[in-house]
A protein has these predicted regions:
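Internal hydrophobic alpha-helix adjacent to the cofactor/substrate pocket in enzyme cavities
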Residues: 379-400
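Short hydrophobic core segments
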Residues: 11, 144-155
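A glycine-rich dinucleotide-binding beta-alpha-beta segment and adjacent secondary-structure elements
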Residues: 307-373, 401-414, 537-591, 596
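Beta1/beta-strand and adjacent pyrophosphate-binding region of the FAD-binding site
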Residues: 2-16
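Conserved N-terminal/central alpha/beta ligand/cofactor-binding core
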Residues: 5, 22-126, 141, 153-173, ...
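Extended, charge-enriched "interface" segments that sit outside catalytic cores
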Residues: 431, 437, 448-615, 619-622
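Conserved beta-strand-loop-beta-strand element in the redox core of flavoprotein oxidoreductases
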Residues: 128-144
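An anion/pyrophosphate-binding glycine-rich loop and adjacent beta-alpha core
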Residues: 37-39, 55, 184-321, 418-491, ...
Length: 623
């Protein structure tokens, strides 16, 4: 049935698996995507949205690298918002509300159009491991499929257990079976496994809601998009979300179910996402709060199904229903399905290399929730990198490892490998020390050349990026070289409450003032003439504005990143014996021996490794 040897097999077709399969196949290697249901590719198991704070930057990075998530998010969006627009550009984060059904449909269409990619529907029961190397997979029907590399992207399916009140049953997602056998094979091979928990809110009938009792949340008046390619366009129409609140009455009703809650009666021992707690966890931990926000999110253009964001719960279904009916606008709500919690297996990510290949089994890669992360975007980015590196390994090429100053994806993977996680990890801008460098607007500058060099990002993408870079640099040079007269600039400065000038000055200096924005600069004739003559579009104008106004911050971060790069250049031998260094702390020896960092820089970020330990290590490496 499967006589030929595949180059790469991807197990699981969620966000991680879909990106992994696409990347591997697009790099020209023979790839097989195995999933329990071909009808459920790239499902949005939780909220119908992509992007958000730090997550939007990741989607842009995936797109810049040649992944599919940005394009598909644009094609299936029903609303666009640029979050944190009142803050500096390092914090701006794009987010779209998505059409859940169209999102999954578009993913399947794009995957089916991808060359070198085959599909097979069946549950994977086990792994074929020989002499410390992956050799393939074994399905529930006993079919063996051989491959040079395997990427596991099992999501919440590994020994998944669903909880609704006092009821519990096996499942990887509502209405779908859990996956059994893989965890057991991995543990037998020497891997450490753990358990995590996540949850999801009820889905309700939008026709039963009174939106007049809620606050309308509209999209941006000038919506942007995720993808840097010209394959997609910004939305021409948008669908509103709404916001309402819980109340003390709602909280009292929810407490009635605490004695039947798996969270409070001890049946759920696993740790859930810190930054996405269940509604029962919120009212228990923040008992002094009189209300909590609920975002009412439509599931698409052509469906009445609504997602109640902020009401994730595993309380009994009767309590869920009773409590929601006490929320303003939900007095006559009809349920499509109740919320639930799910426990699943994961594998502490310190067992991986920065390529996402496992240290124990050569050719085996992990991506997504199996690594302890939460979120579509985090999963998709890991899948992309695992797919890239699995394909590069098969082709006997150097791996692609993104550094912390190159991408949020680099921060994410480095955090997982060097620090590990014992709770579902999600990305925040605060996790990135170089966030002024890692903005959502410049992911193409940072990553497209690297991706093009390995054969993933297209020539067309590269040319578009180079054109954008050239035009924005020319615009910045124009501001540096062009002066503005006292007569022209002082009225603008006076209007903005900024200090007046006594002699003409360079536009760059004027533009650098915090009170002066792009709209002010466009009042000057010289700027208007330049823009008209060079046909400068909004994207270039905004890029130039960021480069001018934040040049000092950007330069400072670049210098700091360059210092870090020097430590990245100091390699540690793969089987280095840390125990022979007498002046290093015992904890550092244990942590370094377990995690096996590749560079001094990675070693310095491991919890329990002090600056003095790093200094000793540097001396030992002859630096």
């Amino acid at each position: 049935m499967f006589e030929d040897l595949y180059d790469v097999i991807v197990v699981g077709a969620g966000h991680a698996g879909s990106e992994a399969a696409a990347a591997s196949a697009n790099l020209g290697v023979k790839t097989l995507l195995v999933t329990m249901s071909l009808q459920n590719i790239a499902q949005m198991s939780c909220n119908p949205a992509m992007g958000g704070i730090a997550k939007g930057q990741i989607v842009r990075e995936i797109d810049a690298l040649g992944g599919y998530s940005g394009i598909i998010s644009d094609k299936t969006a029903i609303q666009f918002k640029m979050l944190n627009k009142s803050k500096g550009p390092a914090m701006w984060s794009p987010r779209v509300q998505s059409d859940r059904m169209r999102f999954a449909e578009e993913w399947r269409l794009m995957l089916e159009r991808t060359p070198n990619l085959d599909f097979y529907q069946e549950m994977v029961r086990g792994l074929i491991i020989e002499d410390g190397k992956i050799k393939g997979i074994r399905t529930s029907l006993g079919v063996e499929i051989r491959a040079k590399a395997v990427v596991l992207t099992n999501g919440t399916f590994l020994n998944g257990l669903i909880h609704i009140g006092e009821k519990q049953f096996g499942g990887g997602r509502a209405g779908e079976s859990a996956a059994y056998g893989i965890t057991e094979d991995l543990v037998s091979a020497g891997f450490e496994a753990g358990r995590m928990k996540t949850g999801t809110p009820p889905r309700v009938d939008g026709r039963s809601l009174d939106y007049l009792k809620m606050n309308e949340e509209k999209g941006d008046t000038r919506p942007d998009k995720f993808s840097y390619s010209d394959e997609t366009k910004p939305l021409s129409r948008q669908k509103s979300c709404h916001m309402t609140y819980t109340s003390l009455d709602v909280h009292d009703i929810l407490r009635e179910g605490f004695d039947r809650s798996p969270m409070f009666n001890g049946r759920i021992q696993s740790i859930g996402p810190r930054y996405c707690p269940s509604i029962e966890d919120k009212i228990n931990r923040f008992a002094d709060k009189e209300r909590h926000q609920l975002f009412v999110e439509p599931e698409g253009w052509d469906t009445v199904e609504v997602y109640v964001n902020g009401f994730s719960t595993s309380l009994p279904e009767d309590i869920q229903f009773k409590a929601l009916r006490s929320v303003a606008g939900f007095e006559k709500v009809k349920f499509f399905r109740p919320g639930y919690a799910i426990e699943y297996d994961y594998f502490p990510p310190t067992q991986l290399k920065h390529t996402l290949e496992t240290k124990l089994v050569e050719g085996l890669y992990f991506a997504g929730q199996i690594n302890g992360t939460t979120g579509y975007e985090e999963a998709a980015s890991q899948g992309l990198m695992a797919g890239i590196n699995a394909a590069l390994k098969v082709k006997e090429q150097e791996p692609m490892i993104l550094k912390r100053d190159e991408a949020y994806i680099g921060v994410l993977i480095d955090d997982l490998i060097t620090k590990g996680t014992d709770e579902p990890y999600r990305m925040f801008t605060s996790r990135a020390e170089y966030r002024t460098l890692l903005r959502q607007d410049n992911a193409d500058f940072r990553l497209t050349p690297q991706s093009h060099a390995i054969g993933l990002a297209s020539e067309k993408r590269l040319r578009r990026m180079e054109k954008k870079l050239t035009e924005s640099e020319k615009m910045v040079a124009f501001f540096r070289e062009t002066s503005v007269s006292v007569a022209d600039v002082n009225p603008v400065l006076e209007e903005k409450g900024s200090a007046l000038i006594s002699q003409s000055d360079k536009m760059f200096k004027i533009f650098s003032r915090p009170q002066i924005d792009l709209a002010d600069m466009l009042k000057f004739e010289k700027v208007k003439e330049y823009v008209a003559l060079n046909e400068v579009d909004q994207e270039i104008l905004e890029q130039a504005e960021i480069q001018v106004k934040y040049s000092g911050y950007i330069e400072k971060e670049r210098n700091n990143a360059d210092k870090l790069t020097r430590l990245e250049d100091v390699k540690i031998p793969e089987f280095f014996d840390y125990h022979k260094i007498k002046s290093m702390s015992i904890e550092a020896k244990q942590k370094l021996s377990a995690i096996r960092p590749v560079t001094i820089s990675q070693a310095s970020r491991i919890s329990g490794v002090s600056p003095s330990d790093v200094s000793v290590l540097l001396i030992y490496m002859g630096r």
